[in-house]
Structure formats: structure tokens, C-alpha cells
């Protein structure tokens, strides 16, 4: 029975990791969507290339790249290097004493990048689904472009994007299992530890599956409530 307390703590770590990645990922998704929609094509192509790379790589590789790449970056900054611009050379060096990187932070960064790569396409599609007439109506009312976007376009865009973003949240929850490879004490790592200690792997992995299922069902309920609230103006009164 004592084994359930570490599992409950690890489940909290999993949900916390997913929520942090969701918050950062949504901000990055909006940034990527704007980046890919830039009017200057080279800038838009650069954004599309980054999103394509993130979507094309296996999720496990992205997690490992961020984790080991962070350590390598700290070593490079500590050793120092020179940026040669031709007419001027810029030395770059930082005094770094601690080269340990936070597995939790690396997990959040990796998962948020993965979430943003897919969510940005959902946001772009949702933005295109808003009728152009909304912009024209806002201009007729004398609103500025920013006011039109935030007061007229964005609320409608989020309603279109909610189903897709909700599905990607469920995928994000499952992707949190990948961070066990970089020693984040999430549900999967704790389950593996308990299974090894008790020599009952099947039993404890079934328990972990049940916990993931409960989290998913709760997420679906919350997403349904959010969707009902967001679309309440579109439903006819009974």
C-alpha cells in the first residue's frame, strides 16, 4: 500500500509537467503561427522549416536533443568562442560553475516545442476560418487593427481551435512519459522503479495505465465544459 504514495506524487509531477508545457507551448504556438504568416517570405520559410523539423523528428529525439544539448551549450559558453562578422569579432564567454541542467526544465522545453509545432497549425487554420468580414466590420466601427484582432477575431479563432488544441493536450499528456528517459520523476519512472523493486511489473504498469486513463477522462470532461462555454452563443435556446 505504501507504493501508492510515490505513484500519487509522480502523477502530480506528470500533470504539473504537462500543464507547464501547455502554457509555454501555447505561447510558442502563437509565436510560430505569426512567424509562419509573416509577409516577408524568407522569414515565413524559416518559421515553416523549424516547425517542419519539430514535426518530423521523433518526440524522443527532441527530448534527448534538448537535454544533452543544454549541457553541451553550457560547456561551450564556459569555454568561450568568437563570433566573426568579418569587420568585427565578438568574443563570447560566460563564467559558469554549475553544469547540471534541470531535467524538469528540459522536459518542459522539449514538450512545449513539440506541442507548439502542432498547435501552431491548428491556430493558423482557426484564424483562416474566421470570416474576412469580421475585419471589415471592425474597420467600419473605427476600431484599430489590434482592437479588431483581440476583441473580434481572437475569440472566434479560439472557438475554432479548441477541439484541435484539446486533442493535442491529450497527446501531450501521453508524451510526458518520454521525460522518464532524462530522469524526471514522473509516473512512468516511478512505476518502473516500483516494478523493479517488487518484481511485479505487470501489476504496476496496469496501475499506471489506470492513472493515465483517469487523468485523460478528467481532461476530456474539463475540455467538454470549456467547449460548451465557448460555444454557448452558437447554440439555440431550448
UniProtKB/Swiss-Prot annotation:
Span of domain ABC transmembrane type-1: 11-223
Keyword annotations of the record: Amino-acid transport, Cell inner membrane, Cell membrane, Membrane, Transmembrane, Transmembrane helix, Transport
One GO biological process term: L-arginine import across plasma membrane
Segments on the Periplasmic face: 1-14, 70-98, 190-201
Its membrane topology: Multi-pass membrane protein
GO molecular function, one term: transmembrane transporter activity
Chain segments annotated as transmembrane: 15-35, 49-69, 99-119, 169-189, 202-222
Role summary: Part of the ABC transporter complex ArtPIQMJ involved in arginine transport. Probably responsible for the translocation of the substrate across the membrane.
Protein name stated in the entry: Arginine ABC transporter permease protein ArtQ
Organism: Escherichia coli (strain K12)
